Design a protein with these regions (language model features):
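Rossmann-fold cofactor-recognition segment
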Residues: 1-8
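A conserved hydrophobic alpha-helix of the Rossmann-fold in NAD(P)-dependent oxidoreductases
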Residues: 9-14, 137
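A glycine-rich helix->loop->beta "capping" turn
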Residues: 12-31, 35-40, 123
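Structured loop/turn residues at beta-strand edges in well-structured enzyme cores
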Residues: 22-23, 50, 122, 167
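Catalytic loop of short-chain dehydrogenase/reductase
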Residues: 33-72, 76-119, 128-134, 152
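C-terminal helical subdomain
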Residues: 61, 126, 145-168
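Acidic donor-diphosphate engagement hotspot in glycosyltransferases and nucleotidyltransferases
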Residues: 136-137, 164
Length: 168
């Protein structure tokens, strides 16, 4: 377990993984996100710097830290996958400041792919499955309303289940 807000834990993770042989890790799943909505979702322009930076560090920059920690043990043809959202190009009010942070996560995927291409063939991808009922989404104010609305808009007229994403 690694708390990405604590640099000593990230350093310990890096040291632990650096002891592994190269090609030990064939794939990494980054599924880390957090946003402080203790005061509820506020209009975007009222976002507090402290909350924005904390959410960016945990939800986006942690992918860079994780990739660096695993770099020496990651297979040359390995894969790094993160979980994004499907609404980085729309403005879902209930998602608050997390939409631009998830957009930065997707940008990090592209830049990590380019950066790692200098020395490997590691693939970086983001899975943007759409609204899912998860323990994390339960903490997003108004999420259920958007989840039920999105369910009506899908071609199959039913929500995507977390098991469907996990089994792909």
């Amino acid at each position: 377990v690694c708390d990405f807000e604590k640099s000593d834990q990230v350093n310990s993770l890096h040291q632990l993984i650096s002891q592994l042989d190269s090609d030990s890790i064939h794939g990494i799943l980054h599924s880390i996100a957090f946003a402080n909505y203790s005061e509820g979702v506020q209009p975007f322009h009222q976002t507090k710097l402290k909350d924005y930076l904390q959410a960016t560090h945990i939800s986006s920059f942690s992918l860079i830290e994780l990739a660096n920690a695993c770099k020496t043990a990651l297979s040359q043809n390995g894969s790094v996958v993160t979980i994004g959202i499907s609404s980085t190009e729309v403005t879902a009010e209930n998602y608050g400041f997390m939409a631009p942070i998830k957009a930065s996560l997707e940008a990090n995927v592209r830049y990590l792919a380019k950066s790692f291409s200098a020395f490997s063939s590691v693939r970086f991808n983001s899975v943007n499955a759409g609204p899912l009922k998860t323990s994390a989404s339960a903490g997003i104010p108004g999420y259920l309303k958007n989840y039920l609305f999105a369910e009506k808009l899908t071609f199959r007229k039913k929500a995507l289940l977390t098991e469907e994403v996990a089994n792909t």
